[in-house]
Structures are given as C-alpha cells and as structure tokens.
C-alpha cells in the first residue's frame, strides 16, 4: 500500500478511518477550489494511509505535529484512489476527509456514542440525515489519560457530511476560504503563532478527546479561540486561525439546540474583533450569534451633547438674524423730526434733557397737529407688517431683557463688593450704634450674635454715640466687637454708675463679651433677671435715626 514520507512517520491528519459518501467526488469536481482542493485531498488521504501502520499505538497522541511538506499538496491521484478503497473497506469514520475541517472540542457529547465499537447501520443512516451533536460524551472520557489525542476520533464522535441535505442558510462556524501557507501547521495542532492574526495558539491537552468538525464554508464572522467549549474543566483551549482552512463543501446543518448552545456559551472576551466577510449567500443563519458585543452609546449620554449643540445652533441663528426694530409711534416720529431743531436751539447735550424738552413740546401740540403724526405712525405700522409679517414685539423684548441682565450682573457684583468694603472700614467710634438700633437689629435677626445685653452700659458712655443714625447694614459681628471696644475705652462716670448697679458676678460677663440671644434665654436664673432689668433702659431711650446733639 503506498505511503508518504511525511517527516519521519509523523501524522498530518486524523488517525481514524473515513467513510466516503458517493456524492463527495461530484461535489469536489463542482467546487471552485481548482488545484487547492485536490491538494487538501492528497494531504489527508496520504495521512490516512500513513497512519494505518501506527493505529495500534497510543503513544502517537503525544507526538508533536510538524508542518506538512510542500510535496504533499502535489501528489498524483493514485493515492486518492487507494485512499478511497481504504475508506470503503473500513467500518467507521477515521477522521474528516478534508483538512479544511477544524476540530472543535465539545466536552459533554452524550453517553451512547462512546462504546468501543462501530455504530450500527441504523445509527449511521440516521447520522447521514441529521447532525448528532447534542447526544454527546460525558466528561468521564475527558479525565481518562489514555483517551485518544485530539487528532484521533476512533469510535467516539461521528463525523457526518451531508452536502445535499442541508439548507444554504444553515451554517454553523466556519473560517475564510484561504489555504494553509506553506510550512504552517494546522491551527489545531500547532502551538506556534498564527501568521495572519499574530495571536499565539497554545496547544490543548491530549486528554480532551471528544470533538467534532465544523464546516469552514459558511460563517467567517465567528473568530477564535472558542473558550466556551470546555468551561467545566477550566483547561486551556487551542485557537483556530480564521484564515487557515479551505473547503469546497457548503456548511453542515445544525439543529436548534446546538444553535442555542452556540449562542449562549460564547464568551465575548475570548474572541478578537472580526476581520472577515460574510457567507457567499450574504444572509447569516439565525443560529450564528456574533460573540462580539456591540457597544451602542446610550441615549442618556447622547442627549446632553445634542441639546447643547442644538442650543448653540439656535443661538447662532438668532445672532445671524438682523435686529428688527419695532415701528415708530407718533411721539417717536415727532421726536425724530424735531430733535435736530431742539439740539440746535439748546446748548444742552444730555439726551435726557433733550427728551424732556421734546416731551413738553409734544404735549403742548394741538389735537390736529398730533393727528398728523398718528397718521404717519399708522402708515409706518402697515409698512412694517408688510416687510416683516412674522415679526413680533416679544422677540425684541426678550433679547433686551437678556442683554440687560448680562450687562448688569458684573456691575451688581462690583457694587456689592464696594458696599461691603465701606461697611468693614468704618472707624470704631462712628460704627457704634445707638442702644435702640442694636436692640432693633437684634429683633430683626434674633439668631445672630449681638451685644444687646451688653449695650445698656456701653452706649451710655458719650452723648455723641446716642446721636448716631440707625445702621442696618453693619454686620452683627462688627457691631458686637465695636460695643466691647467702646465699653473698654469708655471711662465716663455714667458707665461706671450703670455698671455699679449691676451685680458684680453677673455684670462682668455680660459687659465683657457679646452674648447671643439664645444663650441669654438658656442662662441660669441668676443671669436672666439682670437681662430683664437692662431691657427697660433700652426701651426708655428714644429711637433716633438722624438726630444730632443739641449742643
């Protein structure tokens, strides 16, 4: 039996036998593969002949596969005919007839396909009709160290090709129709780096025996690696280069349960971005679910940007529109006509003064003279309505208000700043308020600290302090500090006499520092009567706003 010298007895393909269907030769002749399809056939058939000698040994499962030599793609058809006879004599499949079928491992392929013998003819006939994936091997076969290598399919999982019994829209998982580059090993046998994608391909362990081939002819959009196939064992998976396989046959059919498995078990993070084209039919099957999650921006993220852009566009459009003035009324027409005369007669240059003069003259006019300007104003409105039919006075009013607010905002800020500065830089002798003023401010803002209880002694120091106007703009803190400073600085007999009336343990804390209103209410009963005694003194003095001393 002819054999190939394929690198020291190493195998190139699967170590199992194949059953050749009658329609394979016809399909191969009809396929547009030209010479590369024949090269694939020669490669696999020669490997089948070569592996028949080493079929009894299990040690070849650990043998490292090397790239196929170039000559294997150019062998004559004699080896093909011999391989066909070899396949027809066999009882079961030894492997896929084409190297273009990548092997994908499915860990839980059911139990009744695992006996150590060939399938019955009835089961084989059933396999020709449907893809028997879902009844597949238990994980016990995966744990066996003596189980065949990934290149050995002997009596484990049936590999069925049925090119004539399938719908063109039922592809499962395929790769682009490109041939292996010379010297590049198959993706499922090599631990090297994929020359097309640059992604390292780690070798999968030898104990993962059950796997099944998938057609490479239909779906190029599901890339590798397929880490979802062995989630239970947590073992590393091999990857299949998307440009590494070529097959003339269309895709194999897949039932609904397998499609749900593919759609649910793909892990998006294991798959690189696709760089491929769709099937020749252009319509992917619903079972093919792209593993890459499409990231579409949410409407919440887009709406603020769109709203801001729309606002900017609207503002720009408003700015581009010319400012349409409202039609002049009778008085405005009179002012427009008489302003030049008034300016020539008067030496005043202020616009306000000129407007006042024009207003007086307008009211001094008779009804007949004013009626002339009213008629002019009516004509002006008619002409304006013809020129600008969609114009409304509200447009100008809104714009003017916005402009005024924008212009006034910095001025108001400067005004408030200067006002605060003036309040803070008052001299200490002038910033002291009258006792009534401090008491009134305390009533206005009871929660703020004030020197209302300390004011009975301090304000009575001088007569000029009582004549100060009521100041409501000064801060309570500044007022309290001024009261305490004035009390310490004053040495008049009236202040000493007032302080003498108060008890010594109570008067000193009250007069030494400002006390908030809440603290005076929550103070002990010994302090509260003294505060009540001080209040009549506050109320007895008159409330003077602009009074001056009579001296």
Swiss-Prot record:
The keyword Repressor applies. Phosphorylated. Phosphorylation by csnk1e promotes binding to ctnnb1-A while phosphorylation by gsk3b may reverse this effect. SMART domains: HMG (SM00398). Residues 324-392 bind DNA. SUPFAM superfamilies: HMG-box (SSF47095). One of its GO terms (molecular function) is DNA-binding transcription factor activity, RNA polymerase II-specific. Residues 1-11 have a biased composition (Gly residues). Its main location: nucleus. Residues 109-312 are annotated as: Interaction with AES and TLE4-A. Residues 408-551 are annotated as: Interaction with CTBP-B. GO terms for cellular component: beta-catenin-TCF complex; chromatin. It holds the Pfam family CTNNB1_binding. It comes from the Eukaryota. GO terms for biological process: canonical Wnt signaling pathway; regulation of transcription by RNA polymerase II. Residues 445-464 have a biased composition (Low complexity). Residues 1-77, 183-213, 391-474, 492-515 are annotated as: Disordered. Residues 17-32, 52-77, 407-416 have a biased composition (Basic and acidic residues). Residues 1-61 are annotated as: Interaction with CTNNB1-A. Residues 465-474 have a biased composition (Polar residues). The keyword Nucleus applies. Keywords: Activator, Developmental protein, DNA-binding, Nucleus, Phosphoprotein, Repressor, Transcription, Transcription regulation, Wnt signaling pathway. Interacts with csnk1e, ctnnb1-A, ctbp-B, dact1-A and gsk3b. May interact with ase and tle4-A. Interacts with tle1-B. PANTHER family: TRANSCRIPTION FACTOR 7 FAMILY MEMBER (PTHR10373), TRANSCRIPTION FACTOR 7-LIKE 1 (PTHR10373:SF25). Participates in the Wnt signaling pathway. Binds to DNA and acts as a repressor in the absence of ctnnb1-A and possibly ctnnb1-B, and as an activator in the presence of these proteins. Required early in development for the establishment of the dorsal body axis in response to maternal Wnt signaling. Belongs to the TCF/LEF family. This is Transcription factor 7-like 1-B.
